[in-house]
Amino acid sequence: MTEEIVSADIETNTPRGSKLRPFFGFYGGKWRDAAKYYPSPDHGLIVEPFAGSAGYALRYAHKRVVLCEVDPIIAGVWEYLVEVSPREILAIPDVPAGGTVDDLGLTQEAAWLIGFWVNRGVSRPRKRPSKWMRDRISPGSFWGNRVRQTISSQVERIRHWKIYNCSWNECPVTGSATWFVDPPYQKTGRHYVYGSEEIDFKDLGKWCRTRKGQVIVCENHGAGWIPFRRLADVKTTRAGKRAVEAIWTNNGDIQ
């Protein structure tokens, strides 16, 4: 790690405002559900130790945010987003008909970003547009002018975010924060390159219990590595499918 973040209860000078929209889609992302079901942060720093598409942090982007992500591709996309200019985003063209992301001649990180927009709700960037994108179904959900405009209008608002390509147990934050812990789920999280089979959930449960501040942990209903309670029946990224979500919080009793 290049730094250790000890104290967290300081907000940035970044203007408050409405929530940010997702910078990219990701399998299991929580952006839609974050405002409906999960507690609001009560600390000046939000930490997502399994960052993915950072759906929770996007709802409170004016706060200090630390994203930890073990997958170098996901971490690379976030590192690109916190540095890229709006003009650079607007200059990225559409994928040509019958073509792939490789035809755009982009930097690796930019290609990864677009790869998440040509096929939504995946755990890895794709190169060829999905049939939904090719058929122009819901164009605002795939790479094109509307998405370019959205991302370019938001990148300046995450300049203060910190990104770490590291595992949850290597997170540099040691002080109080709002911890939004959304790991690959124990029974269903094998769709990821760095999936649930690589996680020691007993250790993760102990780690969650010893974080300072507010701790929010996500899982499927029925998981037992921490005493979860049923949260909600939610829509998934798979057409017509729903899932029963569970939650554990420390109720602010760790200070």
Residue ranges and their predicted role:
Residues 7, 63-163, 169:
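Class I S-adenosyl-L-methionine-dependent methyltransferase module
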